[in-house]
Amino acid sequence: MFITIEGIEGSGKTTLINRLSEYFSSRGEDVIVTREPGGCELGGLLRSLVLSSELGLTAESELFLFLADRAQHVSECIQPAIMNGKTVFCDRYADSTIVYQGYGRGMNIGKLWEFNEVAIKGIWPQKTLLLDIDVEKALERACIRNEALGLNIVEGRFESEPMDFHNRIRDGFLHWAGRNPDRITILNADTTPEDLFQQSVSVLREIV
């Protein structure tokens, strides 16, 4: 089983994915938790580049760094895990490229789809959980997290984008989910971590 978690910065993806990992592991599933960028050795190097607030990356450079990370990540981690019958939970995946670079940066979504297909070799998740939350609340969460962990410089580039960018990302995720209703389920993330976890389990029980 391959499940991805998507959403804007500060939507609660990491907390949820850790809860889901614990839950499905306790039910006897062989679970792998991974993320993009940074789910493989190359990805760890690329993550420091693409998320740093100190580098003036162009939109095109940003895109191809994400795609390079994804191609290596799929080949090294996701595809082997799926072939070995493991349950894979991934924090961000190909949908993030469609939304951030397409709806956010204004790139051609058709082209982004084609680039993604090369990187992922046709491996799409069985289910994607989209965590939807008010932009201001989510950014407040993200900024508090980054401040507490000392990540403002090394991983704060997207959080420092203007509010209009984040609104485009939220709207883009919702629009993209509407175009892929069978795979993407929208969850209300403006709630407690426990409620969000219960929402997620209810959805995933239908495909396990």
Swiss-Prot record:
Keyword field contains Iron: no
Catalyses which reaction(s): dTMP + ATP = dTDP + ADP
Keyword Transferase: yes
EC number annotated for this UniProt entry: 2.7.4.9
Pfam families to which the protein is assigned, alphabetical: Thymidylate_kin
Residues involved in ATP binding: G7, I8, E9, G10, S11, G12, K13, T14
Keywords, ordered alphabetically: ATP-binding, Kinase, Nucleotide biosynthesis, Nucleotide-binding, Transferase
GO molecular function (one): dTMP kinase activity
One GO term describing the cellular component: cytosol
InterPro entries for this protein: P-loop_NTPase (IPR027417), Thymidylate_kin-like_dom (IPR039430), Thymidylate_kinase (IPR018094)
Enzyme class: transferase
Domain of life of the source: Bacteria
UniProt similarity note: Belongs to the thymidylate kinase family.
PANTHER family in the cross-refs: THYMIDYLATE KINASE, UMP-CMP KINASE 2, MITOCHONDRIAL
Entry function: Phosphorylation of dTMP to form dTDP in both de novo and salvage pathways of dTTP synthesis.
Record protein name field: Thymidylate kinase
Organism from which the protein derives: Lawsonia intracellularis (strain PHE/MN1-00)
